[in-house]
């Protein structure tokens, strides 16, 4: 039956080969297995193993470029690693461990997680939360998806949130797996409220896959510098607005500010691409390289109504956002 597939994954601990701990370090080479988390450590999940390196997805709010870290595998072995790339928009990072620094034992005990899709996840589906959902290493929970209808707003786009019935821990982190053990989400605390009870939610993996591929290849994330929402057909009709992507705010010193894009503008085209939703804008921008010169066609309010304005912007490398 449907639930038995989750039981098989839990009983066989298939996911254990995917999960690691990343801990900040100075010059120490002491080998010890972490059992609880502090501010300088986080869990990670192996997303790729090549002949040269092991690539691990982690959270950038703990793992910083230039910092010194070690990866702890499930057998307790600790190996130096480096941050290959990070995305300050979402707080995600990709960490690299050289195969040459690992033992045969480590190599036999690990496996890369299979990538799933969050687009196919619907309310009522079971999900496995692995990594650190309870605030300590190797904790695991099985829950049910309550909603996929909410999004979290980030710079240059939005990401679908997978919400569950599982109680959230303030120090919890980790990943969502589906019934086949495939990665479908990354636990986040975005949107947590200042109350006693919050529920575990995750960023849908499908909305961050393109940027993860960039980070895994050592590339930076293109940066425009706006926060946006979607003007749907209904909103446009009820508020007498043009349809498109509404600019809620412009980040200080961003490429968007340099090209004089303003709060309240409604973007309709990027380059030769029509954009009607915040997700479409995010997808279109992710297809460009840093340094790309783009034309932006938008509607801007004036005393005589909305007028078409054409702007030109040069995408830059993503800066560390505050």
Give the label of every model feature segment.
Residues 1, 7, 179, 183-242, ...:
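C-terminal cap/linker of serine protease catalytic domains
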């Amino acid at each position: 039956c449907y639930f038995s597939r989750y039981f098989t994954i839990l009983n066989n601990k298939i996911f254990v080969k995917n999960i690691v701990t990343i801990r900040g370090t100075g010059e120490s080479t002491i080998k010890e297995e972490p059992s609880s988390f502090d501010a300088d450590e986080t869990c990670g999940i192996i997303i790729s193993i090549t002949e040269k390196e092991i690539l691990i997805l982690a959270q950038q709010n703990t793992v910083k470029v230039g910092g010194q870290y070690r990866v702890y595998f499930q057998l307790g072995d600790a190996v130096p690693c480096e941050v290959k790339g990070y995305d300050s928009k979402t707080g995600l990072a990709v960490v690299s461990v050289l195969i040459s620094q690992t033992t045969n034992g480590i190599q036999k005990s690990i496996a890369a997680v299979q990538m799933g899709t969050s687009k196919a996840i619907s309310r009522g589906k079971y999900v496995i939360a692995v990594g650190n959902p309870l605030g300590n290493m190797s904790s695991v929970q099985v829950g049910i998806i309550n909603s996929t209808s909410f999004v979290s707003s980030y710079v240059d786009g939005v990401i679908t949130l997978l919400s569950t019935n599982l109680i959230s821990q303030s120090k919890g982190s980790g990943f969502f797996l589906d019934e086949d053990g495939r990665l479908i989400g990354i636990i986040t605390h975005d949107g947590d409220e200042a109350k006693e009870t919050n529920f575990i939610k995750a960023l849908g993996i499908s909305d961050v896959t393109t940027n993860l591929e960039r980070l895994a290849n050592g590339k930076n994330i293109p940066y425009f510098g706006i926060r946006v929402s979607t003007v749907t057909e209904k909103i446009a009709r009820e508020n007498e607005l043009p349809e498109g992507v509404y600019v809620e705010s412009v980040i200080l010193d961003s490429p968007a500010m340099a090209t004089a894009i303003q709060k309240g503008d409604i973007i309709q085209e990027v380059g030769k691409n029509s954009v009607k939703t915040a997700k479409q804008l995010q997808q279109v921008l992710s297809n460009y390289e840093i340094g790309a010169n783009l034309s932006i066609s938008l509607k801007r309010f004036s005393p005589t109504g909305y007028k078409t304005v054409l702007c030109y912007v040069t995408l830059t490398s993503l800066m560390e956002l505050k």
